[in-house]
């Protein structure tokens, strides 16, 4: 046989590469992008008051530079796809895909085929963390192209080295902060400049950096802000979506800076946050007034610090002086707020289909994709709750792009929030159909019909009746009225002005706090995180075990970002090809984790829920950084918090030893 690669002829012209984002933005830099007049991928702004003037009158100004590098998603299942050509010309596509609808859109553009001839199947994915979008769709597109060409099924499964080399990474950030404080510790102004490396292609960096801009000052009141968040194209590995999506980087900077400011102002870490954190009715840096949901920063911070005993233990920190056993002890915490859903990036929506069967079983499908986060379980729980039936009746069908309308991609911790919104709408519609049909036959009013405990009944008035769910379905089919409904949920309106960075970028927020205790071996320098306490207000918790699992997983994944994961890139080439050269946390590295639920049902969410996948990860790095400072007496502005190591395209950065 002939190897496919032997049939490919390559013609390429050597050009001068650019590996540093600053160099890419020089006026005489060669153009690296297919669109645009320069290498500036995006520029997001926040303008509030006169920040420079306010800094001139500040009692204390802290000026710091922070760096984060490239990070690999490290999903267990590599990219892969199988494509079957059908006799009718349709291509049937399976794969490790994060968003089948966008995969269909990409393949349709590549192959110049109509959507109707591309059916992409929605299967659970063996890990994604934001990484199974662009690259995974490209793999599916190659399988589709080959299948179309040879007229036979084609399977492509990536080896780990291929996955490392081709997949996009978390974008490296250089963050320059100048923040002014009053004598009592109140934040007065912030001037922020952030530069991200988008790499050789533009993926989702324009949107992740937008979130960074909207949340660049953390969950605090700052009356004067000038923030510029930019991304540049380079010849490095391309970057894109990763769990946290622009928040972990700025949270690391802000929460590290807040602890340092507290120390220099003679305040405790708790006091400076209480003075500055957002409360009910406060305005954010973008001018959004938080008055339509519960602002619970003080609740989550109090829950975490009391549970871990922060105020009692902070005085026991080593500050560079080893204990008798040769170890250094430290404790730290961090808080955050995170906009739920995709916000003003795009109009967010989701869909659901519910189809009640003659035998009492129920089929349901949604536009939410299962990436291992437990989305299907959450949808089933919500449907069972609204219909008043047992979960065992409900079968969550793995849909295709031909069966359920677009429901948005599984990103931005939007699955539970948007998915349950569509589920509630579909369930309410099918309940109305059932109620109207049964009352027409048995008497009563539709609004008086109750659904609970696998029964449908009217318990008051002259026309009371009671029947099992199975009996109700039999009546529905006798009447030839089909208990089927399509539901949808569209996120409430949001707003954003690109020139000023003003508006309401998200319709609601998740509030979070995490605290960490750690021990450092003073001789070897190794760090062991021993205890983590996490409190998150993500609205109504649909599935408590999965809620806790998401948080535990996010914490351990975030520990890798904080302490060990250092993806080295040389002249645009990734040096690691497997996990022997890229150190992710192991099970033995996991600390004791205590999860505290702070539940304030969200009035703008049909089911009262928000999301937890990304808030779980975005705080542990600054909590560890603050704990590490109290252990060693040295503060680092880089991630990972290793004594040596590269920091993305900026190379080796001198560690701050202040």
Question: Where are the model-predicted features located?
Answer:
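Structural alpha/beta core scaffold segments of enzyme domains
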Residues: 1-535, 629-632, 645, 649-654
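Cytochrome P450 core scaffold surrounding the K-helix E-X-X-R motif
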Residues: 539-543
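C-terminal substrate/ligand-recognition segments
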Residues: 376, 515, 520, 560-565, ...
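Amphipathic, heptad-repeat alpha-helical segments used for oligomerization and assembly
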Residues: 245, 410, 414, 598-616
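Generic long, charged, amphipathic alpha-helical segments
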Residues: 392-398, 586-609
